[in-house]
Amino acid sequence: MHFLVVYILIHFHAYRGMAALPLFSTLPKITSCCDSYVVINSSTSVSSLISTCLDGEILFQNEGQKFCRPLTDNRTIVYTMQDQVQKPLSVTWMDFNLVISDYGRDVINNLTKSAMLARKNGPRYLQMENGPRYLQMETRISDLFRHECYQDNYYVLDKKLQMFYPTTHSNELLFYPSEATLPSPWQEPPFSSPWPEPTFPSRWYWLLLNYTNY
């Protein structure tokens, strides 16, 4: 069931032209994940210039918190709806059209297909052997995102990654947080994609648990 939800969540949010999500399919694709975006928190004085996210530019949302890119410039804004008395019921999601390249979406699609086949065709003790586990999928997506940043402009990678990670513990994460081992301007970054042995419950598990509750 969880693998099915993974497939539905990623498949519907990762491709353009899906009839079920016409709004997301019209969003422009970020061609570089290392552009010089600026993270603006709602508590800063700068954010008072922008009172809300434009619906067509939302990159990520989780209940009252949204990550959005305004149409007026290339800044990425972390906007928290603090003025609302009651938070709207919403599902945690991220539009992969905006954060993952075509190659990355192909890899994610292959991972979910192999997981679905293992779930459908193999006995339970083989399902975990043949199909990727949640943490492996999460790690793979994180590595793809990290690698694409490195290919473009590695020295702003850490700042760019931080944009996608809410700092509050109440938010489920689709990627690993930035780590001290990430490249810096004075350090040549070797790239590797190790898949650590998964531990449970993973962030994917809590994300799916939250998703299926709606």
UniProtKB/Swiss-Prot annotation:
Post-translational modification comment from the UniProt entry: Glycosylated by host.
Glycosylation sites: N41, N74, N110, N210
Keyword Glycoprotein: yes
Transmembrane domains' residue ranges: none
Signal peptide (UniProt feature, chain positions): 1-19
Location within or outside the cell: Virion membrane; Host endoplasmic reticulum-Golgi intermediate compartment
GO BP annotation list: entry receptor-mediated virion attachment to host cell; symbiont entry into host cell
Record has Membrane as a keyword: yes
Keywords carried by this UniProt record: Glycoprotein, Host-virus interaction, Late protein, Membrane, Signal, Viral attachment to host cell, Viral attachment to host entry receptor, Virion, Virus entry into host cell
Gene Ontology cellular-component terms listed: host cell endoplasmic reticulum-Golgi intermediate compartment; membrane; virion membrane
Subunit structure: Interacts with isoform gQ1. The heterodimer gQ1-gQ2 associates with the glycoprotein complex gH-gL to form a tetrameric complex. The gH/gL/gQ1/gQ2 complex binds to human receptor CD46.
Function of the protein: Plays a role in virus entry by participating in host receptor binding at the cell surface.
Name of the molecule in the record: Glycoprotein Q2
The organism of origin for this protein: Human herpesvirus 6A (strain Uganda-1102) (HHV-6 variant A)
Lineage, broadest ranks: Viruses, Duplodnaviria, Heunggongvirae, Peploviricota, Herviviricetes
